[in-house]
């Protein structure tokens, strides 16, 4: 999982990528290609 300052590029990397909020942090999850997971500080 990458830790990024901006998730704008992360959510456009794959068409299945979704932005979700968990525990006050913002995550990008990708079911079909999990190597595109990312988190914002």
UniProtKB/Swiss-Prot annotation:
The keyword Iron does not apply. PROSITE patterns: RIBOSOMAL_L36. Pfam families: Ribosomal_L36. SUPFAM superfamilies: Ribosomal protein L36. One of its GO terms (molecular function) is structural constituent of ribosome. GO terms for biological process: translation. One of its GO terms (cellular component) is ribonucleoprotein complex. Belongs to the bacterial ribosomal protein bL36 family. This is Large ribosomal subunit protein bL36B. The lineage of its organism: Bacteria, Pseudomonadati, Pseudomonadota, Betaproteobacteria, Nitrosomonadales. The gene is rpmJ2.
């Amino acid at each position: 999982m990458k830790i990024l300052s901006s998730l704008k590029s992360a959510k456009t990397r794959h068409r299945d990528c979704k932005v979700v909020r968990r525990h006050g942090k913002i995550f990008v999850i990708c079911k079909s290609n999990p190597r595109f997971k990312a988190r914002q500080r």
